């Protein structure tokens, strides 16, 4: 059992070293885009299925409430939280539209819409990002594996370099926490007013 635990932790460390090498610049670019989204008065819409839905809710919670520093709340909505809306849309239009219908209702040009998918192939996430792009939003994917079909509909596809779903999920939550830190510092903290 201990050797299994050690192997899991070694795999985690190896992934994070790979992420440091491959994703530092893309995460910084994404943070800049999100900071600009909030600066111009727009909002963040976030979605995913299963564990990715939980990540979307976690991300929205940190943005609306706070991450590390006291600051004004920022507008972010997780599209996986309202069971009445999700089941109404699912019943009337089908599961594939549970997110896209919400994007149609809530998104305005300049918003940022983030789809989280470990496989990169969730049809309902892809459909929502397609709708978001047509609405003039920035489309972002937190993806895994090779980015799947969702990669093609993202202005910024951020792909965790792993084919193992638990590792991808660990990478996603690390990126989410880093983004929360950078957004807060960029708007209210040590990076505010800098040319970063």
Swiss-Prot record:
<feature type="binding site">
    <location>
        <position position="62"/>
    </location>
    <ligand>
        <name>Zn(2+)</name>
    </ligand>
</feature>
<keyword id="KW-0119">Carbohydrate metabolism</keyword>
<dbReference type="InterPro" id="IPR035461">
    <property type="entry name" value="GmhA/DiaA"/>
</dbReference>
<dbReference type="GO" id="GO:0008270">
    <property type="term" value="F:zinc ion binding"/>
</dbReference>
<comment type="pathway">
    <text>Carbohydrate biosynthesis; D-glycero-D-manno-heptose 7-phosphate biosynthesis; D-glycero-alpha-D-manno-heptose 7-phosphate and D-glycero-beta-D-manno-heptose 7-phosphate from sedoheptulose 7-phosphate: step 1/1.</text>
</comment>
<feature type="binding site">
    <location>
        <position position="169"/>
    </location>
    <ligand>
        <name>Zn(2+)</name>
    </ligand>
</feature>
<dbReference type="InterPro" id="IPR001347">
    <property type="entry name" value="SIS_dom"/>
</dbReference>
<feature type="binding site">
    <location>
        <position position="122"/>
    </location>
    <ligand>
        <name>substrate</name>
    </ligand>
</feature>
<dbReference type="GO" id="GO:0005975">
    <property type="term" value="P:carbohydrate metabolic process"/>
</dbReference>
<keyword id="KW-0862">Zinc</keyword>
<feature type="binding site">
    <location>
        <begin position="91"/>
        <end position="92"/>
    </location>
    <ligand>
        <name>substrate</name>
    </ligand>
</feature>
<feature type="binding site">
    <location>
        <begin position="117"/>
        <end position="119"/>
    </location>
    <ligand>
        <name>substrate</name>
    </ligand>
</feature>
<feature type="binding site">
    <location>
        <position position="169"/>
    </location>
    <ligand>
        <name>substrate</name>
    </ligand>
</feature>
<dbReference type="GO" id="GO:0005737">
    <property type="term" value="C:cytoplasm"/>
</dbReference>
<comment type="function">
    <text>Catalyzes the isomerization of sedoheptulose 7-phosphate in D-glycero-D-manno-heptose 7-phosphate.</text>
</comment>
<dbReference type="InterPro" id="IPR050099">
    <property type="entry name" value="SIS_GmhA/DiaA_subfam"/>
</dbReference>
<feature type="binding site">
    <location>
        <position position="62"/>
    </location>
    <ligand>
        <name>substrate</name>
    </ligand>
</feature>
<dbReference type="GO" id="GO:0008968">
    <property type="term" value="F:D-sedoheptulose 7-phosphate isomerase activity"/>
</dbReference>
<dbReference type="GO" id="GO:2001061">
    <property type="term" value="P:D-glycero-D-manno-heptose 7-phosphate biosynthetic process"/>
</dbReference>
<keyword id="KW-0413">Isomerase</keyword>
<protein>
    <recommendedName>
        <fullName>Phosphoheptose isomerase</fullName>
        <ecNumber>5.3.1.28</ecNumber>
    </recommendedName>
</protein>
<keyword id="KW-0479">Metal-binding</keyword>
<dbReference type="Pfam" id="PF13580">
    <property type="entry name" value="SIS_2"/>
</dbReference>
<dbReference type="InterPro" id="IPR046348">
    <property type="entry name" value="SIS_dom_sf"/>
</dbReference>
<feature type="binding site">
    <location>
        <position position="58"/>
    </location>
    <ligand>
        <name>Zn(2+)</name>
    </ligand>
</feature>
<feature type="binding site">
    <location>
        <position position="177"/>
    </location>
    <ligand>
        <name>Zn(2+)</name>
    </ligand>
</feature>
<dbReference type="InterPro" id="IPR004515">
    <property type="entry name" value="Phosphoheptose_Isoase"/>
</dbReference>
<feature type="binding site">
    <location>
        <begin position="49"/>
        <end position="51"/>
    </location>
    <ligand>
        <name>substrate</name>
    </ligand>
</feature>
<feature type="domain" description="SIS">
    <location>
        <begin position="34"/>
        <end position="193"/>
    </location>
</feature>
<dbReference type="GO" id="GO:0097367">
    <property type="term" value="F:carbohydrate derivative binding"/>
</dbReference>
<keyword id="KW-0963">Cytoplasm</keyword>
<comment type="subunit">
    <text>Homotetramer.</text>
</comment>
<comment type="similarity">
    <text>Belongs to the SIS family. GmhA subfamily.</text>
</comment>
């Amino acid at each position: 059992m201990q050797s299994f635990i050690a192997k899991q932790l070694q795999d985690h460390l190896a992934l994070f070293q790979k992420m440091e090498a491959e994703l530092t610049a893309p995460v910084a670019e994404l943070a800049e885009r999100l900071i600009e989204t909030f600066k111009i008065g727009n909002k963040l819409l976030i979605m995913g299925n299963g564990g990715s839905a939980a990540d979307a809710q976690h991300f929205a919670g940190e943005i609306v409430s706070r991450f590390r520093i006291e600051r004004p709340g920022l507008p972010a909505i997780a599209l996986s939280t309202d069971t009445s809306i999700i089941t109404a849309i699912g019943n009337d239009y089908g599961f594939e539209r549970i997110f896209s219908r919400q994007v149609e209702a809530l998104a305005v040009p300049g918003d940022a819409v983030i789809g989280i998918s470990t496989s990169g192939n969730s049809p309902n996430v892809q459909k929502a990002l397609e709708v978001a792009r047509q609405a003039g939003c920035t489309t972002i994917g937190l993806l895994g594996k090779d980015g799947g079909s969702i990669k093609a509909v993202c202005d910024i596809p951020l792909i965790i370099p792993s084919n193992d779903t638990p590792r991808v999920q660990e990478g996603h939550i690390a990126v989410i926490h880093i983004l929360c830190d950078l957004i807060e510092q960029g708007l209210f903290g040590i990076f505010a007013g800098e040319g970063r």
